[in-house]
Swiss-Prot record:
Belongs to the GHMP kinase family. GalK subfamily. It comes from Enterobacter sp. (strain 638). Substrate binds at residues 34-37, 223. Pathway: Carbohydrate metabolism; galactose metabolism. The gene is galK. Keywords: ATP-binding, Carbohydrate metabolism, Cytoplasm, Galactose metabolism, Kinase, Magnesium, Metal-binding, Nucleotide-binding, Transferase. Its EC number is 2.7.1.6. It catalyses: alpha-D-galactose + ATP = alpha-D-galactose 1-phosphate + ADP + H(+). GO terms for molecular function: ATP binding; galactokinase activity; magnesium ion binding. This is Galactokinase. The active site is at 174 (proton acceptor).
């Protein structure tokens, strides 16, 4: 049963009338450009065919009722006329409440709604299930009430909700690609201007995501440390962000910086350059060059930004040894576990899957999860 069918039937069964709209917003994978977003840099993600789907309808009062199909049909209900506060026990509710609260600050022109939510974006894998939910909820109210908000505004609204209401410090990439993704394309995003450029993926290329299933523990504290180190670097150069520092400037004075900060800054500067070049390589159908850039990106995350773990490095080595120069593979996401992404010719998928299933668990004691994804359209009706 599709997510749409599942949410529509649960909607009718629970609320006693049919939903008028079904909205989807996808998860994402970042092909290259890691830890560049909060440095005002460039990222190159694509939306994937795993998504959050919400069946919904307007109400004629100011109440919002929500059912989470993936959490044993837990429910939430709140009024638009009362201050919206965090839910004591249901974390998923806070994503919905946060988005609605921040939407009210942007535009008061909407009333209540009934929502049933389901999704298949793997949680905790770094594929942005939370951003997908935030963008889906924002799109629900935008569509039901014809709010004059574009995809970028819905994305910013989701980011604000996550930063200020849920309390998780994230950049803008995840929400923006969920809102604006384009089928069969990646999106080069300038995280300062929020400008986007659609980049076609080479014909016959598959996006493969492999979850290491290594439980991420350090991700929150270490993420914040990396941000602070980058901010220290930007202050040293008296610039608002590392985006504004050139590699030449950096190389001249790198020896004056704290050695750890030097490594962090070098990663961000070189990763920005790689990301812009990767967009050109993809547009020219040059998977070989894309593969080289992904390999450089992974080495930089491992050695300079120090956010990989042995299990992730093992996965990358297995895939790289299998595909050679036929494509690329690197860690993707915040780090300390999570997933690797590979961009490879479709005909190489079985060989990669075989190699990983034969070697990864034997070397690490953990069984991976393998996803083959299609670059998909951003949020909208489904």
């Amino acid at each position: 049963m599709s997510l749409k069918d599942k949410t529509q039937s649960l909607f009718a069964e629970t609320f006693g009338y049919p939903a008028t709209h079904a909205i989807q917003a996808p998860g994402r994978v970042n092909l290259i450009g890691e830890h560049t977003d909060y440095n005002d840099g460039f990222v190159l993600p694509c939306a994937i065919d795993y998504q959050t789907v919400i069946s919904c309808a307007k109400r004629d009062d100011r109440i919002v009722r929500v059912i989470a199909a993936d959490y044993d049909n837990q429910t939430d209900e709140f009024s638009l006329d009362e201050p919206i506060v965090a839910h004591d026990t249901q974390q998923w509710s806070n994503y919905v409440r946060g988005v609605v609260k921040h939407l009210q600050m942007r535009n008061k022109g909407f009333g209540g709604a009934d929502l049933v939510i389901a999704g298949n974006v793997p949680q905790g894998a770094g594929l942005s299930s939370s951003a997908s939910l935030e963008v889906a909820v924002g799109t629900v109210f935008q569509q039901l009430y014809h709010l004059p908000l574009d995809g970028a505004q819905i994305a910013l609204n989701g980011q604000e909700a996550e930063n200020q209401f849920v309390g998780c410090n994230c950049g803008i990439m995840d929400q923006l690609i969920s809102a604006l993704g384009k089928k069969e394309h990646a999106l080069l995003i300038d995280c300062r201007s929020l400008g986007t450029k659609a980049v076609p993926l080479p014909k016959g290329a598959a996006v493969v995501i492999i979850n290491s299933n290594f439980k991420r523990t350090l991700v929150g504290s270490e993420y914040n440390t990396r941000r602070e180190q980058c901010e220290t670097g930007a202050r040293f150069f008296q610039q608002p962000a590392l985006r504004d520092v050139s590699l030449n400037e950096f190389n001249k004075v790198a020896h004056e910086l704290d050695p750890v900060v030097t490594k962090r800054v070098r990663h961000v500067l070189t990763e920005n350059a790689r990301t812009v070049e990767a967009a050109s390589a993809l547009a020219q159908g040059d998977l070989k060059r894309m593969g080289e850039l992904m390999a450089e990106s992974h080495a930089s995350m491992r050695d300079d930004f120090e956010i990989t773990v042995p299990q992730i490095d093992t996965l990358v080595e297995i895939v790289k040894a299998t595909i050679g120069d036929k494509g690329g593979v690197r860690m993707t996401g915040g780090g300390f576990g999570g997933c690797v992404v590979a961009l490879i010719p479709e005909e190489w998928v079985p060989a990669v899957q075989d190699a990983v299933s034969q070697q990864y668990e034997a070397k690490t004691g953990i069984k991976e999860t393998f996803y083959v994804c299609k670059p998909s359209q951003g949020a909208g009706q489904c």
